Amino acid sequence: VLHNLSIRDEMGDVVTSTPRPFEVHESGALLHGTKADLAVGDYLVPGRESNYEAGRIMNHVYVTRTLDAAVWGAEMAAGEGRGRIYIVEPVGELEDDPNVTDKKLPGNPTHSYRTREPVKIIGEITDWVGHSPEQLQGMRDGLADLRRRGLDVIYD
């Protein structure tokens, strides 16, 4: 069972780097970014309130293989506290996330998926580096613009 995943250099020091879009995490694991304070062995389940839209109950749990997408999830999630990135294992089948698949780019370059089944937390990445303040503000501004234009649709 994985608990904490750290990448170390030849001197044994933990290596951190800014997440890069479309780059699969070196572990190959599925990841989930959130602000929820959970423990190894807990399950993420459908039927909970959205991290991004107050009052909306989600039919799916969303996961990714890229650290960048998981970091965005952790940073943009509603709630107090620090963002967290969990290493997860789905109980059931995954499907491509239709919110990003074949949208701005063909295919599923963010390696983003969803499931209607529970997802078990098997570890946590604790040494990740977030996006710059400028990137965060750019994302917030872009989402606010979509909201103003009525285009902030989540296909769930």
Spans of model-derived segments:
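Short secondary-structure boundary/capping segments within folded domains
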Residues: 20-23, 52-53
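Active-site and NAD+-binding cores of ADP-ribose-processing enzymes
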Residues: 2-5, 12, 17, 24-28, ...
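A short linear-motif detector with a strong N-terminal bias
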Residues: 8-12, 41, 62-68
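Extended catalytic/binding region for NAD+/ADP-ribose chemistry, centered on the ART fold
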Residues: 49-79
